[in-house]
Amino acid sequence: MHEKKGGGYDLRQVQYPLGNWPSIYVMNPGNPQWVNYLSGSINKVYQNLRFDGYHIDQLGHQREAYYVNLKSKKVNGKKVYTDGDRRDTHDFEDYFAKFINRMKADNHNKYLVMNAVSTFGGAKIVGTGNVEFGYNEMWDGDDYLWNYRKIIQDNRYNNGKNTFNTVFAAYLHCRNGNGGQFHTSSALFGNATIFALGGSRIELSGDHMLFTEYFPDNARKMSEKLQESIIHYYDFLVAYENYLRDGNVETSVNMTMDGVNVAAWDLSAPNPSVAEAANQTIGPKPYSVNTYSTTKGDVTMIQLLNYNNVSRDNFNIRDLKETMPEPNVLKNKKIVLDDATSVSRIWVASPDYLGGAPQEVVFSQREGKVSFTLPSLAYWTMVVVEHGNKADSSETEVKNYVLQGESFVEAKDEAVAVGEAYLSFPATVAKTLHASLPLVPVTDGITNVTDNVRTGYYTVSGIKVDKPVKGVYIHNGKKIMGK
């Protein structure tokens, strides 16, 4: 039973309307009879279908109170409910945890995840230790860049493991009334921020990008550029996961770019005296390149996020207004980093440059200052600083090669198509290489053919084959053409 807005009480099964579709019944996860019923139903599913587990969903904080132990009286021969024991809906947060623990106890070998809609019940959910990762669906009051970092850190704290990960559902341009293609810069700035902070994102369903919580809805499309870029971003997320979210500890660095201070992400807690989340000034600084930095062992990871033409009004992920500008791409910027510890190696990588291939950079270190040149910064570039003694006191070099035809050719710029192969060589090897590396040995021709007793057919590379096909072969000391 729930209080009516106009007074009195409403006794009915609460439903969440879905337009022309059947409504969803809203159940009380603290009701033991319902939990027992659902547990039995889930067990039947597991007995007949080989699911690995299931996703538990909720609707967030919908109401302030509900009533149990209802009281009634007869009015004109009809039962009328008049009162009951008022309960706070925040009780549901504890109910969520008990529900998760019950489901895990019933099927300990199955996996669970539960959506903390707008963080409702989030601490209790991840605190069970029985969900595989934090899952947070972000809506209007949550969608602030500083809040994404806070949720990632809160989930790790409440779970008790610094390696605990978080996945966000933040639907791009959700129901803003517009059609057409997604805003590419909105998608890439959002992914750059979430991934750099150590999070992940659920935004793809089949072959399309999500813009509502109804996953089959594919009314909005990705541009060709976004389709290509999104592959680079997810390749990058997987390739460098140990540098992004593997128990790293937050830190801050002092850095200049062409002599101008680079802003460090403000890691402060929200100001409790500021009522509106939109008015918080923590997190990144607008109209600036920002760093978000972590350490692990002797390695410091510096995430450079290029907000140099982004206002605070655009410091959200979903970009309902579709006003996120494209970044001003920065090239060959001189970086000076404060670091008193001996640096052995620096390399950079970006999903926006060379398909994410790592590039070792030349650097010098004097009196606690490390200087190097940053090749490129579009949306996001990661700088990895490794500490320790240098194996070689000479300046470091690196060469990256992109497959073109039957050779790997030294990469000169960032124009790399999706799906191409890359080679990247360390400094000691790079100095010995040429600008082109053929896949097969190159010969100037066949000379000094000597007849011998060996029979069979040999390729020009000296490989014996049983039956020649098209090409040039050596047989009984003579050159022949296979047809």
Regions found by a protein language model. Give the residues of each.
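Active-site-adjacent "subsite" loops/lids of carbohydrate-active enzymes
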Residues: 1-49
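Active-site neighborhood of glycoside hydrolase catalytic domains
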Residues: 28-133, 139-149
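Active-site-proximal substrate-binding groove within the catalytic cores of carbohydrate-active enzymes
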Residues: 91, 95-137, 142-303, 307-314
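Solvent-exposed beta-strand/loop surfaces of large extracellular or lumenal domains
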Residues: 344-370
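Contiguous ligand/interfacial binding patches
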Residues: 346, 389-420
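C-terminal beta-strand-rich structural cap/linker in extracellular carbohydrate-active enzymes
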Residues: 366-388, 418-435
